[in-house]
């Protein structure tokens, strides 16, 4: 009886472990990239306002603003990831030399429910390239902000992340509610 009990325990443990491994394997990271490019001249203005996401600003010698937004959902299925992506509206506008990028989560359940999605994780990463001489007005409700090698006025605000500035020349106004600021 003791041997039968051991075999039953080993079989049950193996079945339980297999179930856990298979369930864990069902989770995966899905990405959706959105890219937009605008022709500008140095000295223009970029405004980014987003409900969630990190914002990384790089500079170039060119006359373009290039926005690459990567939406990332860590969820059980591609179709569920697409439903999450569909609730994040990203809009772009250009008026002369000014560029505006707005990221907004649209859901009747509310912002904090959106962050969890029943255990699914969602994030956005903005990688934006601007001319070296450009002005920035950046705001994210949840994410880090990084800016490097820029000559212009900067306003950067995050409610839940760090702000990193490297070789930025011009007036600065930076604020974080839950992170560090490094100049």
List each model region and its residues.
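N-terminal secretory signal peptides that target proteins for export/translocation
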Residues: 1-8
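Acidic (Asp/Glu) and glycine-rich low-complexity loops/linkers
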Residues: 2, 23-49, 54-140, 148-158, ...
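General helical structural elements
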Residues: 8-10, 40
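Bacterial N-terminal signal peptides
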Residues: 10-23
């Amino acid at each position: 009886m003791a041997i039968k009990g051991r075999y039953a325990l080993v079989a049950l443990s193996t079945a339980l472990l297999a179930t856990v491994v298979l369930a864990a394997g069902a989770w995966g990271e899905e990405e959706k990239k959105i890219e937009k490019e605008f022709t500008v001249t140095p000295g223009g203005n970029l405004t980014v306002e987003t409900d969630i996401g990190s914002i990384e600003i790089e500079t170039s010698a060119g006359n373009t603003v290039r926005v690459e937004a990567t939406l990332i959902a860590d969820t059980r299925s591609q179709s569920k990831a697409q439903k999450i992506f569909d609730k994040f509206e990203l809009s772009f506008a250009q008026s002369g030399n000014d560029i505006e990028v707005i990221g907004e989560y649209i859901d009747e359940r509310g912002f904090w429910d959106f962050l969890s999605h029943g255990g699914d994780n969602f994030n956005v990463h903005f990688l934006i390239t601007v001319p070296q001489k450009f002005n920035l007005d950046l705001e994210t409700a949840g994410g880090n902000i990084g800016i490097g090698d820029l000559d212009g006025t900067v306003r950067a605000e995050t409610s839940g992340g760090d702000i990193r500035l490297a070789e930025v020349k011009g007036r600065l106004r930076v604020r974080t509610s839950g992170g560090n600021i490094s100049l």
